[in-house]
């Protein structure tokens, strides 16, 4: 006896086999020198050009020597009162 509210199990489809020659062509297309078009990357680049953020891992402005342990440059103390 079947119930009106019972659901049947979904039918799973098998993927077609992937050929090695298809993989070689796909790998070559991934690394072509294309400009990144994501909104996140675009906003990040605009912020860097405006000087409002530190150089990111995506920019080539990093030297690799930047760490959190660097001593701050000597300068006058800033006051929050003006």
UniProtKB/Swiss-Prot annotation:
It is found in: Nucleus; Cytoplasm; Secreted, Extracellular space. InterPro entries: MUSTN1. Keywords: Chondrogenesis, Cytoplasm, Myogenesis, Nucleus, Phosphoprotein, Secreted. Residues 1-34 are annotated as: Disordered. Signal peptide: none annotated. A motif (Nuclear localization signal) lies at residues 10-18. GO terms for biological process: chondrocyte differentiation; chondrocyte proliferation; glucose homeostasis; muscle organ development; positive regulation of chondrocyte differentiation; positive regulation of chondrocyte proliferation; positive regulation of gene expression; positive regulation of myoblast differentiation. Coiled coil: none annotated. GO terms for cellular component: cytoplasm; extracellular region; nucleus. The modification Phosphoserine is found at residue 2. Belongs to the MUSTN1 family. Required for chondrocyte development and proliferation. Plays a role in myoblast differentiation and fusion. Modulates skeletal muscle extracellular matrix composition. Plays a role in skeletal muscle function. Plays a role in glucose homeostasis. This is Musculoskeletal embryonic nuclear protein 1. The gene is MUSTN1.
